[in-house]
């Protein structure tokens, strides 16, 4: 949410977040966001949140944090509730990417690939003797963020 707040806060009005973490729920609610308290693996929660009429659905929780479900199952549920929505899913393993597409995802992000891209830039900075500059750049970015979970 912090990235959206920084880049295009007007989008926040169009977003509904589903979360069962009370800290996340309270923090986002206090910021004026539309938050539904519930488990994303529960079909009733998805219906209550309006998944059936959403244009874009982002499943950002990796399988390792999901209880009783996985992203493939969630994509199938969401796709059955909303055949026309654009669905973005998260994969931790490259071997999961094709399964998520087959389940109905329109786009699959593999977070460790973006992490690897960032880490490579850190390695380049270290090799160029610019690691302190890279850290200062990152510290400045962190200072302007308002993350939901610290």
What label would you give each PLM region?
Residues 1-150:
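Cytosolic regulatory regions of ion transport systems
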């Amino acid at each position: 949410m912090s990235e959206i707040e920084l880049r295009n806060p007007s989008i926040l009005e169009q977003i509904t977040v589903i979360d069962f973490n009370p800290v996340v729920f309270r923090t986002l609610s206090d910021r004026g966001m539309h938050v539904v308290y519930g488990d994303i693996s529960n079909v009733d929660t998805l219906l209550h949140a309006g998944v059936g009429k959403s244009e874009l659905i982002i499943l950002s929780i990796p399988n390792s944090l999901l209880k009783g479900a996985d992203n493939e199952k969630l994509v199938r549920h969401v796709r059955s509730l909303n055949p026309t929505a654009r669905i973005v899913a998260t994969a931790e393993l490259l071997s999961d990417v094709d399964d998520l597409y087959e389940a109905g995802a329109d786009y699959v992000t593999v977070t460790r690939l973006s992490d690897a891209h960032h880490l490579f830039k850190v390695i380049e900075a270290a090799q160029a003797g610019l690691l302190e500059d890279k850290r200062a750049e990152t510290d400045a970015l962190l200072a302007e963020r308002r993350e939901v979970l610290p």
